[in-house]
A protein has these predicted regions:
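Membrane-anchoring hydrophobic helices of lipid-metabolizing enzymes
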Residues: 1-109, 142-146, 151-153
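Soluble catalytic domains of membrane acyltransferases
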Residues: 77-195
Length: 195
């Protein structure tokens, strides 16, 4: 209920202010949440060459950016409608050179900046694209988020064994797919990472 209330408020105040307020809440979460402490611990391991102040700056910038993404999620349909004026694509010539016949291709990315908007750019380059996604754990948010994504993610492929088969079927059918591959998954063998 809290998340839906926040998204309603973000939508009410508009895209720019919603993004800003989301960023402010993200900063607060980075300072007081257990996730903020986990991020600080991971940064100390990953970037020991940075001072504690620099590590804190990196951590808070990450939390602010994630907060901004959440603030912008309430406006995904608007962003999709205004993509021509809001989105610029650099390096499109590389995609065109790699896919002279139009595809299909596998686009791989991570959760950087507003990762939701990446699909708009891919679709501008190659048309409708299948997107692998993980359903939110919060059942109340699941339907809302899928509806928000309808504007730019017409082919949604849920993560998991069935999704893997659907992903291959989509590629074999001549349609490109996109994956964000930096998520942790509960399946598989555990490994020690960074000590």
């Amino acid at each position: 209920v809290l998340a839906k209330t926040l998204f309603f408020a973000y939508r009410l105040v508009g895209l720019r202010l919603g993004s800003y307020l989301g960023g402010r809440l993200g900063l607060l979460a980075g300072k007081i949440s257990p996730d903020g402490q986990r991020a600080a611990d991971n940064l100390a391991k990953a970037m020991p060459h940075l001072s504690e102040a620099e590590q804190e700056q990196v951590k808070l910038a990450c939390f602010e950016q994630v907060g901004r993404v959440f603030g912008e999620m309430a406006h995904l349909p608007k962003i999709a409608r205004e993509a021509d004026s809001r989105l610029s694509i650099e390096g499109a010539e590389h995609v065109e050179a790699a896919l002279p016949d139009g595809g299909p291709a596998i686009f791989i990315g991570g959760h950087f900046a507003n990762w939701e908007v990446v699909m708009l750019g891919i679709q501008r380059l190659v048309g409708d694209t299948g997107a692998l996604y993980r359903e939110p754990k919060n059942v109340f948010m699941r339907k809302w988020l899928l509806n928000q994504r309808d504007a730019f993610m017409p082919i949604k492929i849920p993560a998991g064994p069935e999704g893997s088969r659907e992903l291959l079927k989509t590629l074999k059918g001549g349609t490109s797919v996109a994956l964000l591959i930096d998520q942790s998954l509960p399946q598989g063998d555990p490994i020690t990472f960074m000590g």
